[in-house]
């Protein structure tokens, strides 16, 4: 692909290499390292003048370091006379802080959007924002990709299902569950829950005809897995035959791996928007999001529809 440069951040270089490979490109020669005092150093070692530059950084842990790295890389690119700059952020951190749920708190998702634009991005590519409304925090084009087609394709090829039902772990994820259910040709269920404080959830009940079925719980993020495991236990108690979990972003914080390992969940399927390979455990299966992002980049460059990837 002519006229395109791909710059990889350090947070998920394997994914960046896969995306570049899909497009038949190599990664641009760039030095991203840390000074002895902890400051981030960015240096682009080849000309990018007049190119469409895609900077790929997933805002994984350490989140603040990777966010600052993204901003500095965008600034370095902006000062190098490119034709256009696209920030590719497979996992958009701070997305769960998208409103003031209590007095005197920041809207962190909006601030991150402002910083990315100020640093120089002309366009943003993201995958499964926690709240789709975050797109409205940007004043530049946002290509909001969804991993549902990728997860569906993997499930179809690798999981034998006789009588499935897709379950959303909360009311906010119903659209995601419906999209997957439509592809699988099955019904949906919804978990009703109350979250008393951050990172803790109390699962209440499930709406839907689930008895005797194979439940596929679908979510955007698996963090500490408390909600997910509680949902799985509830479904088993309500009579489902099997439980499979899938999500776009596998953070797996704190006790997540232990919880999932000891849970009734048979498989945990996530994409590689985050570098999950170091947290590999027996139930984990990882599917690459690179072809989806790569195809979106190709279509942007060709001026063809990106949204048709999901319809």
Curated annotation (Swiss-Prot):
InterPro entries in the record: Pribosyltran_N, PRibTrfase_dom, PRTase-like, Rib-P_diPkinase, Rib-P_diPkinase_bac
Pfam families found in the cross-reference section: Pribosyl_synth, Pribosyltran_N
Catalytic activity annotation: D-ribose 5-phosphate + ATP = 5-phospho-alpha-D-ribose 1-diphosphate + AMP + H(+)
BP-aspect Gene Ontology terms: 5-phosphoribose 1-diphosphate biosynthetic process; purine nucleotide biosynthetic process
Binding site for ATP: 37-39, 96-97
Cofactor: Mg(2+)
Subcellular location: Cytoplasm
Functional summary from the UniProt entry: Involved in the biosynthesis of the central metabolite phospho-alpha-D-ribosyl-1-pyrophosphate (PRPP) via the transfer of pyrophosphoryl group from ATP to 1-hydroxyl of ribose-5-phosphate (Rib-5-P).
NCBIfam families given in the database record: PRK01259.1, ribP_PPkin
Protein name (Swiss-Prot/TrEMBL): Ribose-phosphate pyrophosphokinase
Gene designation per UniProt: prs
């Amino acid at each position: 692909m002519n006229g395109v440069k791909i710059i990889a951040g350090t947070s998920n270089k394997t994914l960046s290499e896969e995306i570049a490979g899909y497009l038949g490109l190599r990664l641009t020669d760039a030095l991203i390292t840390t000074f002895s005092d902890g400051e981030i150093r960015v240096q682009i070692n080849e000309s990018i003048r007049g190119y469409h530059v895609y900077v790929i950084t997933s805002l994984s842990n350490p989140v603040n370091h990777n966010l600052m790295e993204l901003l500095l890389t965008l600034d370095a690119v902006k000062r190098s006379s490119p034709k256009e700059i696209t920030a590719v952020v497979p996992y958009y951190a701070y997305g769960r802080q998208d409103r003031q749920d209590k007095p005197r708190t920041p809207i962190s998702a909006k601030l991150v959007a402002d910083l990315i634009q100020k640093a120089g991005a002309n366009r943003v590519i993201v995958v499964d924002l926690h709240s789709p409304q975050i797109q409205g925090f940007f004043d530049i084009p946002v290509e909001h990709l969804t991993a549902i087609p990728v997860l569906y394709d993997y499930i179809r090829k690798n999981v034998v299902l006789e009588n499935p039902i897709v379950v959303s772990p909360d009311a906010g994820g119903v659209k995601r569950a419906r999209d997957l259910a439509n592809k699988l040709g099955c019904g949906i269920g919804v978990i009703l829950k109350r979250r008393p404080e951050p990172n803790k959830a109390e699962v209440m009940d499930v709406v839907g005809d689930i008895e005797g079925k194979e439940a596929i719980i679908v979510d955007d993020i698996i963090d500490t897995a408390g909600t997910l495991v509680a949902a799985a236990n509830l479904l088993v108690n309500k009579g489902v035959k099997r439980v499979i979990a899938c999500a776009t972003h596998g953070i797996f914080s704190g006790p997540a791996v232990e919880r999932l390992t000891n849970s009734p969940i048979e498989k945990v399927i996530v994409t590689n928007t985050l570098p999950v390979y170091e947290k590999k455990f027996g139930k984990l299966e990882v599917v690459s999001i690179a072809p989806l992002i790569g195809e979106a980049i190709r279509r942007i460059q060709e001026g063809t529809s990106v949204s048709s990837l999901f319809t």
